[in-house]
Amino acid sequence: MSWRNNLRDVEPYVAGEQPKMSNLIKLNTNENPYEPGEKVKEAIQSFDPFKLRLYPDADASKLKHLIAEYHGLEDDQVFLGNGSDEVLALTFLTCFNGQNPILFPDITYSFYPVYCELFNIDYKTVALDDAFKIKKEDYFNKNGGIIFPNPNAPTGELMSVDDIEDIIKHNSESVVVIDEAYIDFGGETVIPLLKKYDNLLVIHTFSKFRSLAGSRLGVALGNKELVSHLYDVKNSFNSYPIDALAQVIGEASIQDSEVIKEHAKKIIATRERTKKALKEMGFTMTDSYSNFIFIHHDDYDAEYIFKELRKKHIIVRYFNAPRINQYLRVTIGNDEEMDAFLDAVKEIIQAS
């Protein structure tokens, strides 16, 4: 059969497990434990299904305007896609086709190398330091583009805006993409830097902070020319990526922002309480600024804890990968879920 040779060897991204078991505490895919705001629920209830017979607004104009207004930008600085994964894929295809390899951390979002293999993009992974932090100087070398999450995933470590700005300054001929999927759980966004740098692109998602993982809404924010090129590529694939109901839900979510910020505060408080309890059990962890924690115990195998938790219907994320195969990534759920998680971990340790 004749098809593109590079596609034969692509190893697709493996998404977090979505188990169907009952009485499940699901702490493996960084979903928000709280419901979307009331305006989202009202928007869904009042949506006229007769509208689904028509194609949606291809530009998602109202949603785009609300997002731009929320971030203090112009409408034509906003790119919308069907989830941030689609936005990232189109970003790789649009921005990372130079002669030099692109750079991203060795421990990061595992979709990045998949995009590179899929689109035949040369890349080089840059090792995090022993504390799983990004060293800005490692990104001052010649490259065809740079991308990393901030906070990073799965470590949760946060890089300062000043350090990111240094990277942007040293790479004026490359596009620097900052994936801010988790920025609203304690970090500082680099969006204000868009006023100073044309080579910066910022990726956001409605999945985490806004509790809309099931609706699939992703955003890229950048200078007008860069965003225009993203739309050129997107429209060569699909002119209608945001369905009509998702647009209405997204609009309502922006209007619900103050309520959602209170949910984020709850998650942060629960995260810090959980970290304290785990430290008392002998766990160590990274300085997570996200809605998850990345934990390790010197005396207990991570995969063993992962499997024992599963027996108790608690699902966390285990990565069988170099440097991190003795760590677990644990999504921060609500207080009841995290109490059950802590009790289960204590039982596992005491029984070992």
Question: Where are the model-predicted features located?
Answer:
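N-terminal "arm"/small-domain region of PLP-dependent enzymes with the aminotransferase-like
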Residues: 1-54, 142
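Phosphate-binding glycine-rich loop
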Residues: 52, 61-101
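PLP-dependent aminotransferase-like
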Residues: 94-149
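Active-site phosphate-binding strand-loop segment of PLP-dependent enzymes
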Residues: 129-184
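PLP-dependent enzyme catalytic core of the Aspartate aminotransferase-like
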Residues: 162, 308-312, 317, 321-352
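PLP-dependent aminotransferase class I/II
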Residues: 199-279, 283-286
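Conserved PLP-binding catalytic core of the aspartate aminotransferase-like
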Residues: 268, 280-312, 328
